[in-house]
Amino acid sequence: MRILIIASGNSPQLSPFVKEQAESLIKQGLSVDFFLIKGKGLFGYLGNYFLLIKKLKHKKYDLVHAHYGLSGLLATLQFCVPVIITFHGSDVNMKKNYIFSRIASRLSTTNIFVHQSLPNKLKIYRSSPNIIPCGFDQNLFFPISKDKAREILKWKKNEHYIVFSSSFDNEIKNVQLARSAISKINNCNFIELKGYEKKKINLILNASDLLLVTSFSETGPIIVKEALACNCPIISTNVGDVQKLIRNVQNCYLSSYNPKDIEVTAVKKGSGWQSEETFGVVEDKSKGVIFFVASSITPIRSIFEFAII
């Protein structure tokens, strides 16, 4: 089966999730190519239309798999190849993206959703929508000694390191709240997760005192799953699946949007954080939650095969 993956190409690096999923598909014997979109907003995306048509004429594909609603809308404007769209959350939850995602969801052959709330928001009421949560690579995220991780990163042992869940310029991640909450913590280094390879992120999570998630909206944030795999303490606003992910997990806490609450929790609980503690199970089979990238490939492949029948 030959797949063309359509995704944003505006960042220097391909989205880690898209890249890892593609690599897993290749290991399953599928042929995968990429069409990376240059441009922002509706007209920026649609400006790639003739390049996409040229790509599809140059090489025969069995299926187009688009990530996010705007990519999906572009993909569905050609009628030669079946289209599957994976909706990730911001393409549905953000008002400026919603209408484009809703239109694309009607034009596609079928859809995949990373969270169970998304089909209803798009007013898709099929009896069994395709829900496949984003996963992480368990071969890349695992606990190591905090001291060892800091030594490799050349971080100071006697200072605090708090890692933010994303890049500072992503508005939905709400970095202003995070900065306000930690502003009075002494010797605190605030780490932006931007532009790092996954192996480096594994070191950062193991070396850090805390992962801070202050988002206005999320679905099932991969960074929280990766942090759990690294035994990194977490303070997060109650967004997406975070409450379910960290329930009864030691040194992980939900917070309000009051910066004082986050500060008090960080200072009060900080003395008890130890890098060697066990934080519990990341894969919860009893609830049918799939967190590993490799585990999600079989259902994705089944959806692909059904779409081209």
Residue ranges of model-derived segments:
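Short His-centered aromatic/hydrophobic patch
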Residues: 66-71
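Acidic anion/phosphate-binding donor-loop and adjacent secondary structure
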Residues: 95, 120, 136-152, 173
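Short alpha-helical donor nucleotide-sugar binding micro-motif in glycosyltransferases
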Residues: 105, 203-208
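A short, active-site helix/loop in glycosyltransferases that binds the activated sugar's phosphate group
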Residues: 108-131, 136-140
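Conserved donor-binding/catalytic core segment of Leloir-type glycosyltransferases
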Residues: 154-173, 179-182
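Aromatic "clamp/platform" in nucleotide-sugar-dependent glycosyltransferases that forms part
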Residues: 216
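Short hydrophobic beta-strand element within catalytic cores of glycosyltransferases
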Residues: 233-236
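Conserved acidic donor-binding segment of nucleotide-sugar-dependent glycosyltransferases
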Residues: 248-258
